């Protein structure tokens, strides 16, 4: 039976999203103008924020760009904010957009080196505890200098590759032949137990790597997009950012590694599964074959990528240019010295990051509404009436709770804008601002590991082709993240409460930090002029 034109429009709207979700989004779009014009713009603004958080929380039903974008377009259309204000937010955060566009694409052309490193780690270390720590440490180190999304993309590529190699053999086929590894129809009965254990083994490594991106990502200004936003508003460079965060991030890092060891040793929350010996033998044989087939051309590419990695770290550490521009140099160097010159091949590098970049532009549209409607002003004003550590603690908790259900880039951007406005208006001192910026950064990065909604890298894992292969569902991901969530959130809170102020004072006394003056303050004042 032919479908009517009206039903066709409904079916096409938001694609494969459930009908109840489509109806909900349409309801939001109908209700918002009435609330804005007939009730109160302030209430309408908060309603929009809740609706947008809902689209982020339901990211597995529909990617948030479309429903969130429709809400943002309507908000501009009815006057909740203006196109000029949205543009202002985008221009103010151009470095973040450049990071996502160029840095992620740049690392795409270094995947060969990263795949090589992770492969050697996976095969070379037999102890599961040491292997888990290695994956966590490697992901943390890489995320301190690269975008976490990129690091996870590499880990996913490695994991899919190794999964498919064994799946072929378990299905009675040669590893070099083409094979559909998404179905277990041809898996031999004797191999099924090994396959299930292998899935569990890969799940645990993937989660350790994911947590590693959070542990390393919180430490530096380039580890997460919101870090760059916060550093930009505070006028901090690469080294100062690391030092200011260290009273919280170093204890969290150590406790995170301890948690990694304990969950593996005591097999807590789905961890502790060993790599089956049959699987190891197949993987080692495959790696030996790959090594034999590797030519000088391949080794030349690996050498070039290693040298580019050194340039990347030096460029970031010395702040030689905006992070995104350093990413652009990586693209140019990597493609020049590995022979990638076709436009089509270049285009593939941008596929991973551009959807999230577009979503970030929508974030900033919602932030523009929050600023124009003064939505967070009452909350910020109340918190700023608190004394001493209570201010930092409340900011950490508020950021942490919201980051568990919403994207931490969105949360961090909102709070740092409000605190910046308080600084420019003379409500708080520059030293207070620096302390609150640390609380906001750690609050958005650490508790957000609780759910895939908070961390873009986690959501990327859950929506990837790998998740169904290794049976990694939303619920299982939350369950496996639970030990880390508890430890990271509580140790971070303790760091804010007991260590941040005394350690920062010690850094001042040692001359590692200097009290920022009005000269630094003036660098952030223009961005706050709304």
Swiss-Prot record:
UniProt lists the family membership as follows: Belongs to the NhaB Na(+)/H(+) (TC 2.A.34) antiporter family.
On whether Ion transport is a keyword of this UniProt record, the answer is yes
Q: What is this protein called?
A: Na(+)/H(+) antiporter NhaB
Q: Which reaction does it catalyse?
A: 2 Na(+)(in) + 3 H(+)(out) = 2 Na(+)(out) + 3 H(+)(in)
A Gene Ontology molecular function term for this protein is: sodium:proton antiporter activity
**Pfam (any one):** NhaB
What is the predominant subcellular site recorded for this chain?
Answer: membrane
Record keywords: Antiport, Cell inner membrane, Cell membrane, Ion transport, Membrane, Sodium, Sodium transport, Transmembrane, Transmembrane helix, Transport
GO CC list: plasma membrane
InterPro entries, sorted: Na+/H+_antiporter_NhaB (IPR004671)
Provide the transmembrane region boundaries: 13-33, 34-54, 64-84, 90-110, 113-133, 136-156, 205-225, 234-254, 306-326, 351-371, 378-400, 450-470, 481-501
Q: What does this protein do?
A: Na(+)/H(+) antiporter that extrudes sodium in exchange for external protons.
- Its topology with respect to the membrane? Multi-pass membrane protein
The protein's location, in the record's own words, is: Cell inner membrane
């Amino acid at each position: 039976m032919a479908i009517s034109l009206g039903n066709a429009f409904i079916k096409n709207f938001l694609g494969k999203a459930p009908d109840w979700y489509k109806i909900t989004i349409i309801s939001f779009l109908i209700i918002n103008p009435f609330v804005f014009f007939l009730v109160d713009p302030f209430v309408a603004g908060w309603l929009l924020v809740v609706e947008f958080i809902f689209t982020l929380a339901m990211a597995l039903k529909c990617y948030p760009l479309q429903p969130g974008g429709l809400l943002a377009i309507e908000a501009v259309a009815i006057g909740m904010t203006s196109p000029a204000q949205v543009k202002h937010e985008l221009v103010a955060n151009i470095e973040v957009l450049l990071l996502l566009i160029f840095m992620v694409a740049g690392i795409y052309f270094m995947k060969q080196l990263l795949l090589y490193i992770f492969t050697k780690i996976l095969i070379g270390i037999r102890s599961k505890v040491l292997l888990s720590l290695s994956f966590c440490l490697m992901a943390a180190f890489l995320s301190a200098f690269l975008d976490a999304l990129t690091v996870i993309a590499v880990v996913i590529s490695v994991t899919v590759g190794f999964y498919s190699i064994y799946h072929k053999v378990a299905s009675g086929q040669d590893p070099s032949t083409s094979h559909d590894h998404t179905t277990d129809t041809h898996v031999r009965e004797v191999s099924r137990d090994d396959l299930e254990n292998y899935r569990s083994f890969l799940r645990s490594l993937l989660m350790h790597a994911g947590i590693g991106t959070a542990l390393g990502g919180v430490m530096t200004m380039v580890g997460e997009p919101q870090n760059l936003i916060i550093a930009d508003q505070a006028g901090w460079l690469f080294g100062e950012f690391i030092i200011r965060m260290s009273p919280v991030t170093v204890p969290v890092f150590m406790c995170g590694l301890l948690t990694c060891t304990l969950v593996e040793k005591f097999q807590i929350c789905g961890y502790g599964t060993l790599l089956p010996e049959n699987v190891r033998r197949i993987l080692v044989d495959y790696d030996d074959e790959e090594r034999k087939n590797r030519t000088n051309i391949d080794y030349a590419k690996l050498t070039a990528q290693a040298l580019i990695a050194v340039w990347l770290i030096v460029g970031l550490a010395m702040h030689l240019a905006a992070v995104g521009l350093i990413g652009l140099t990586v693209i140019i160097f990597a493609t020049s010295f590995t022979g990638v010159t076709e436009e089509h091949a270049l285009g593939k590098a941008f596929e991973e990051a551009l959807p999230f970049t577009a979503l970030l532009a929508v974030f900033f549209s919602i932030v523009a509404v929050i600023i124009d409607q003064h939505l967070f002003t009452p909350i910020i004003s109340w918190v700023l009436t608190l004394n001493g550590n209570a201010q930092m603690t409340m900011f950490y908790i508020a950021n942490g709770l919201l980051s568990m259900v919403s994207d931490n880039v969105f949360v961090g951007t909102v709070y740092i804008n409000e605190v910046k406005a308080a600084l420019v208006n003379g409500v708080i001192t520059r030293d207070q601002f620096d302390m609150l910026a640390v609380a906001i950064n750690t609050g958005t990065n650490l508790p957000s590991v609780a759910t895939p909604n908070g961390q873009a890298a986690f959501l990327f894992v859950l929506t990837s082709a790998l998740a169904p292969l290794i049976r990694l569902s939303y619920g299982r991901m939350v369950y496996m993240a639970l030990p880390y969530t508890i430890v990271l959130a509580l140790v971070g809170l303790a760091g804010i409460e007991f260590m941040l102020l005394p350690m920062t004072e010690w850094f001042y006394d040692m001359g590692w930090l200097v009290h920022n003056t009005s000269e630094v303050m003036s660098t952030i004042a223009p961005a706050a002029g709304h």
